Amino acid sequence: MANNYDFPKTREQLNQLVADLSQLQTNIQQTHWYMRGENFFRLHPLMDDYNDQLADQLDNIAERLIAINGSPYSTTHEFIEHTGLPDEKVTWDQLTMSDFMQRLSDQFKYLRDQYQKGIEIADIEKDFPTQDMLNGFKEAIDKNIWMINAYLGEGPYDE
């Protein structure tokens, strides 16, 4: 009898998302600490909101991974080894507020693409609960991109 609940490629992609979400949270925290400028009071708490959003997504993805017989990455070493996002040291005087926000937009676009990949893989493997979860998370990331790009004077799909 075939195992209808074996989703190896979905598990692999969920683990990719675990690594990427963990790194993105670190990058957002870096922005939170080092941002300066006239929009500081508005953007500084927004970074907390983004990290709260990503922490919720990360927890749900890791728990879904366990539910489908996977083992989420759980060490800093694993996150750094597997993430597709940069691990860059910056200081407050290296980047402008717009630079930080552009970097954040680019990283959210990367995450959006990883969610899309996960949605497609889950569809192929017929893991529809995972697909539903990722659709909701991608929708939230799409909104983040739209709003950040509007701040930058761009459209949501401007590259």
Show where each model-derived region lies.
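Long, contiguous binding/interaction regions
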Residues: 2, 35, 40, 52, ...
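Short conserved catalytic/interaction loops centered on acidic-Pro-aromatic/His motifs
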Residues: 127-131, 150, 156
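Amphipathic, non-transmembrane alpha-helical scaffold segments
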Residues: 14, 44-51, 55, 101, ...
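A structural signal for well-ordered alpha-helices, especially hydrophobic packing surfaces
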Residues: 18, 25-28, 32, 51, ...
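Acidic/histidine-rich alpha-helical segments that form the ligand environment
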Residues: 59, 83-136
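Helix-loop segments that flank and shape redox-cofactor active sites
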Residues: 2-9, 24-49, 114-129
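Conserved alpha-helical segments that form or flank metal/cofactor-binding pockets of metalloenzymes
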Residues: 42-79
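Disorder-to-helix initiation segments
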Residues: 1-17, 97, 104
